[in-house]
Design a protein with these regions (language model features):
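Long, intrinsically disordered, charge-dense linkers/tails
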Residues: 1-222
Length: 222
C-alpha cells in the first residue's frame, strides 16, 4: 500500500470519471465519508476539468470504454460553460457502444443521416448529455466541414488499401461530395478546408480508386 498526504489525494466520489489520472482515497463506502473531514485533511473533493478530460483521452488512447460518470462530470462542467470543454471539439471523444469505438462530435447527429457507417444518430443512453455534446459540436445535420471530414475518412481508408470505393461507402462518398459542393456554393467553406481537399486523394479515378486531384489532372491531359 502507498501512503500519501491529504493534499495529494482526491475523494472517491465518482472516481471512475478520472481514475487513471489521480491518487484516489481508497475508501469505497462513500456514504460514510464526511466531506468536512476530507476538506480538513486537504483532500480534493471535486476533480479539475482537465483531469477528467485527460482521463477520457487516456480511454481513447487505450480503447477502453469510459465510465458513464466521465461524461456526467463533463456534462455538468459544460452546463457551467467551462472553457476547457471546447478542447474536445474535433477529437474522437464520444464512445458509441454499438460500434465499440470513439467517434468525433461531427460523426454524431440528433437526427438520422444517410451517411452509412461514418455517421450515427445519438444513442438514447447519451441524450442526457446534450449540454456537453452541443458544446463540443454535435449538431442536427452535417455542415460543409463535416462532409469534408467524412469524405476524408472514406478516401483515407480506401487509399491505404489501394481499393476502389464501392457499395454503400460509394453512396456516402457521393453524398459528401454533393454536400461539399453545395456548401462551397453558399461560400460556407474556407480556404484552409479547400486546401485539405486539394492535398488528399479526394478524387476517384475511372477505377473508383482515391487519387490526388493533381494526378487526375495529369492523367486527363495525357
Amino acid at each position: 500500500e502507498n501512503w500519501h498526504s491529504g493534499s495529494d489525494l482526491y475523494a472517491p466520489y465518482r472516481a471512475e470519471a478520472f481514475r487513471s489520472q489521480a491518487n484516489i482515497l481508497d475508501f469505497r463506502n462513500t456514504a460514510r465519508l464526511k466531506t468536512e473531514l476530507l476538506e480538513d485533511l486537504d483532500v480534493t473533493i471535486n476533480p479539475e476539468t482537465r483531469l477528467v478530460i485527460d482521463h477520457l483521452q487516456y480511454c481513447v488512447k487505450t480503447g477502453a470504454q469510459p465510465h458513464v460518470s466521465t461524461y456526467q462530470v463533463l456534462n455538468e462542467r459544460a452546463q457551467r460553460s467551462d472553457p476547457l470543454i471546447s478542447t474536445l471539439a474535433g477529437s474522437r471523444c464520444i464512445y458509441v457502444e454499438s460500434q465499440k469505438s470513439f467517434v468525433r462530435p461531427n460523426q454524431l447527429y440528433w437526427s438520422p443521416q444517410q451517411l452509412g457507417r461514418y455517421a450515427f444518430t445519438i444513442p438514447g443512453n447519451l441524450e442526457v448529455f446534450k449540454p456537453l455534446f452541443t458544446a463540443i459540436g454535435v449538431k442536427d445535420a452535417p455542415e460543409g466541414r463535416d462532409y469534408v471530414d467524412i469524405l476524408l475518412d472514406i478516401v483515407g481508408e480506401y487509399f491505404v488499401q489501394s481499393k476502389p470505393v464501392a457499395g454503400s461507402d460509394r453512396s456516402v462518398y457521393d453524398a459528401c461530395l454533393m454536400g461539399v459542393s453545395a456548401a462551397d456554393e453558399r461560400e460556407e467553406i474556407g480556404a484552409s478546408t479547400i486546401r485539405r481537399l486539394q492535398e488528399a486523394p479526394t478524387i476517384l479515378n475511372l477505377m473508383g480508386q482515391p487519387t490526388h486531384p493533381d494526378e487526375v489532372l495529369l492523367q486527363d491531359s495525357e
